[in-house]
């Protein structure tokens, strides 16, 4: 993978079917390429979440689907690339820097769905902005344990989902 110490820019050029000079035109180092890959993955995740937010389903269904879409997509990206997985856990602060734009987009999507839920009488919440940020940071906080399989590891999916739904909808005062 890109961040392997033995991987050279020449290896990356061969794998990407680009010339080494072409790579150096856009990237200064392997590290820059790695961060571009992380950013690209986050853009795809953002698009996936936007598609869920735009679905013609109830706001409560959207919230749960957005949460699972995010967690499952991050887990899939991390496991698809073993080095990315190792670096995700080891280099979290660097990844955090790249994630700022994604985080802002995600909070806006949560706000839109929460607002829709309030307008339709599905949720009773006082402060949509604060609630969207709290949902975002709660989901972000369980990301690593979810990826590592620590959340609901001894439960079947249906039971685990029931707990998640009860927690999320309890917090949003679903009517």
Q: Where are the predicted features?
A:
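Active-site loops and adjacent core secondary-structure elements that bind or stabilize anionic groups
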Residues: 1
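Helix-turn-helix
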Residues: 4-32, 36
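Hydrophobic/aromatic residues within well-ordered alpha-helical segments
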Residues: 30, 37, 41, 45, ...
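Hydrophobic alpha-helical connector segments
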Residues: 36, 40, 50-76, 131-135, ...
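Secondary-structure edge/capping motif, primarily at the C-terminal ends of alpha-helices
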Residues: 52, 81-88, 146-150
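Short secondary-structure transition hinges
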Residues: 71-109, 119
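C-terminal peripheral helix-coil segments that are non-catalytic and often amphipathic
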Residues: 108-120, 133, 137-175
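Membrane-interface starts of transmembrane alpha-helices
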Residues: 124, 128-132
């Amino acid at each position: 993978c890109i961040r392997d110490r033995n991987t050279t820019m020449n290896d990356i050029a061969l794998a990407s079917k680009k010339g080494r000079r072409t790579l150096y035109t856009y990237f200064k180092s392997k590290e820059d390429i790695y961060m571009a890959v992380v950013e690209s993955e986050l853009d795809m995740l953002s698009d996936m979440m936007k598609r869920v937010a735009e679905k013609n389903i109830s706001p409560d269904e959207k919230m749960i689907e957005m949460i699972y879409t995010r967690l499952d997509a991050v887990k899939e990206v991390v496991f698809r690339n073993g080095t990315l997985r190792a670096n995700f856990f080891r280099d979290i602060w660097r990844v955090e820097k790249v994630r700022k734009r994604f985080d802002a987009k995600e909070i806006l999507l949560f706000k839109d769905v929460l607002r829709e839920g309030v307008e339709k009488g599905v949720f009773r919440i006082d402060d949509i902005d604060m609630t969207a940020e709290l949902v975002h940071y709660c989901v972000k906080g369980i990301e690593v344990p979810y990826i590592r399989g620590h959340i609901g590891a001894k439960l079947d999916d249906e039971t685990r989902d029931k707990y998640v739904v009860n927690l999320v909808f309890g917090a949003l005062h679903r009517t």
